[in-house]
Regions:
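Alpha-helical membrane-targeting segments
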Residues: 1-18
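Solvent-exposed, flexible loop/coil residues
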Residues: 5-8, 27, 36, 63
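Weak global preference for isoleucine
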Residues: 7, 21, 36, 69-71, ...
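Short beta-strand segments
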Residues: 16-51
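Short, structured beta-strand-loop surface elements
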Residues: 42-45, 52-101
Length: 101
């Protein structure tokens, strides 16, 4: 999926709310990159909904509190911290972005 996300026309149209996140696995210690669909909340927050959370494990890396995460937004690699939120409306990872230098 990543190469498709880098094609400018597709990025602006079809994949407007898709990008990649990168984090280090809590147990494995391995760097993981995966495509996600996101929603921006202001300038400093991004929400990643987790569909069928009971069948996925990646979001659990953020369940015990803020953990470092990378995300590519508007062609810029950003860093921040992610926290998993589980509620009546489902599961999401809320990313608070670090300020730009």
């Amino acid at each position: 999926m990543e190469p498709l996300l880098r094609i400018p026309f597709l990025k602006r149209t079809v994949f407007k709310s898709m990008t990649d996140i990168t984090y280090t696995g809590r147990r494995s210690g391995k760097r993981v990159t995966l495509p996600i669909v996101f929603e921006r909340r202001g300038d400093d927050q991004v929400v990643v909904g987790v569909a069928m959370a009971d069948r996925k494990t990646w979001w659990r890396n953020f369940a015990s509190g803020p953990e470092p995460i990378g995300i590519r937004l508007d062609g810029v690699d950003r860093t921040g911290t992610g926290v998993a939120k589980v509620g009546d409306k489902g599961t999401a990872v809320v990313i608070t972005l670090d300020p730009l230098p």
